[in-house]
From Swiss-Prot:
<comment type="subunit">
    <text>Monomer. Interaction with RNA polymerase subunits RpoF and RpoE is necessary for Tfe stimulatory transcription activity. Able to interact with Tbp and RNA polymerase in the absence of DNA promoter. Interacts both with the preinitiation and elongation complexes.</text>
</comment>
<keyword id="KW-0238">DNA-binding</keyword>
<dbReference type="GO" id="GO:0006355">
    <property type="term" value="P:regulation of DNA-templated transcription"/>
</dbReference>
<dbReference type="Pfam" id="PF02002">
    <property type="entry name" value="TFIIE_alpha"/>
</dbReference>
<keyword id="KW-0804">Transcription</keyword>
<protein>
    <recommendedName>
        <fullName>Transcription factor E</fullName>
    </recommendedName>
</protein>
<feature type="domain" description="HTH TFE/IIEalpha-type">
    <location>
        <begin position="7"/>
        <end position="91"/>
    </location>
</feature>
<dbReference type="InterPro" id="IPR036390">
    <property type="entry name" value="WH_DNA-bd_sf"/>
</dbReference>
<dbReference type="GO" id="GO:0003677">
    <property type="term" value="F:DNA binding"/>
</dbReference>
<keyword id="KW-0805">Transcription regulation</keyword>
<dbReference type="GO" id="GO:0006367">
    <property type="term" value="P:transcription initiation at RNA polymerase II promoter"/>
</dbReference>
<dbReference type="InterPro" id="IPR024550">
    <property type="entry name" value="TFIIEa/SarR/Rpc3_HTH_dom"/>
</dbReference>
<dbReference type="InterPro" id="IPR016481">
    <property type="entry name" value="TF_E_archaea"/>
</dbReference>
<comment type="function">
    <text>Transcription factor that plays a role in the activation of archaeal genes transcribed by RNA polymerase. Facilitates transcription initiation by enhancing TATA-box recognition by TATA-box-binding protein (Tbp), and transcription factor B (Tfb) and RNA polymerase recruitment. Not absolutely required for transcription in vitro, but particularly important in cases where Tbp or Tfb function is not optimal. It dynamically alters the nucleic acid-binding properties of RNA polymerases by stabilizing the initiation complex and destabilizing elongation complexes.</text>
</comment>
<dbReference type="InterPro" id="IPR036388">
    <property type="entry name" value="WH-like_DNA-bd_sf"/>
</dbReference>
<dbReference type="InterPro" id="IPR002853">
    <property type="entry name" value="TFIIE_asu"/>
</dbReference>
<comment type="similarity">
    <text>Belongs to the TFE family.</text>
</comment>
Length: 139
């Protein structure tokens, strides 16, 4: 059974493949600072301002960050502080697309709302690894 760290690493690799490796570094910097301006984030990540903005706009569309205008400065505020949930949010549109293509059955934890593939559900013996609740099939 894969460890939580292995699962996160796999999700992180998938996010990097889809959005680029800069997305991971931007997210990690946001997790450290919670509220930060674009220029500072650019310096902290080592990426150009345009690259950072592209990542931020993607995160904004997904509801992970929001911008705040304060005294002629745009600040970005992280709305979700759980790294794995951020990765899940970024991967969700692709997982849904993949599910539609393959007809794969998904399982959901009715308590926390996390989604699992059949393989993951089997791996966790159809119990949510976060809270132990029995997973239900999503149709």
């Amino acid at each position: 059974m894969p460890t939580s760290k292995q699962i996160i690493n796999k999700k992180q690799d998938e996010v990097s493949d889809i959005y680029g490796k800069e997305m991971i570094r931007v997210i990690r910097s946001l997790l450290k600072h919670k509220i930060i301006d674009t220029e500072s984030l650019s310096k902290k990540t080592g990426y150009s301002i345009n690259t950072v903005r592209r990542a931020l706009y993607t995160l904004q569309k997904m509801g992970i960050v929001r911008y705040i205008n304060k005294e002629d400065k745009t600040l970005w505020q992280l709305l979700e502080t759980d790294y794995e949930k951020i990765l899940d949010t970024l991967l969700e549109p692709y997982k849904k697309e993949e599910k539609a293509e393959t007809g794969e059955l998904l399982f959901i934890c009715p308590k926390c709302g996390r989604k699992y593939t059949l393989d993951e559900a089997e791996m966790y013996e159809f119990r949510c690894p976060e809270d132990g609740t029995l997973l239900v099939a999503n149709q």
